[in-house]
Amino acid sequence: MGFIDLIEITAAIIALLIAIIGHEIMHGWVAYKYGDMTAKNSGRLSINPLIHIDPFGSILVPLMTYFIPMLMGADSGFLFGWAKPVPIHTNTVIRNGGYNAAMQVSLAGIVYNLFLATFSSVILLSMSQPTEADSIVYVFGYIFILKLLLINVILAVFNLLPIPGFDGAHFISYFTLKYKIYAVAEFFTKAEPYGMIVIIIILVTPLKIPLVMWPIQTVLNLLVG
């Protein structure tokens, strides 16, 4: 493993933590604005990464999808993971703000990721690609911004998919409940224990290309051309 690989891994870890931890904090923060104190009282609105780390989603999944393939010399362009879900008392949110509030909570993390992706793209477009003459600080900064852009786009796209247990499914559930269509929410609730299986199937089969890779490339084209 070369020095540039070490820089890339460090930048990727920091960018991933910023993306996944901020994603969860935003869910809790919006819920807090609608009177749900659960996340705040449990200390989950803190930026301390240790309280947000999920052993599977924050460590094992990134290792499987990015770091191990990279160390083996394979393509390392797909980094995915998640933080420990922030506890939210949805009934409190709905009682205080209705289903619109619940939908806002569902989308809060995605909005955060899209904001960071847009912000990163603006910075990236103002930078020139590093050369051997550039300092280590500049090289690290460029790689970090690039990773921050890629990771946040990946997270936004994945969470928009209607996968049981993920934000897209939660949004659809609350949207249909608002119009008293109960069957959809019941389906997603019953299917939630199988959401992880769906994720694994998407990651290890050709389904990843139309469901994830194409949307990711579309968003990246819109942001940086």
Language model features with spans:
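Hydrophobic transmembrane alpha-helices and their immediate loop junctions
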Residues: 1-225
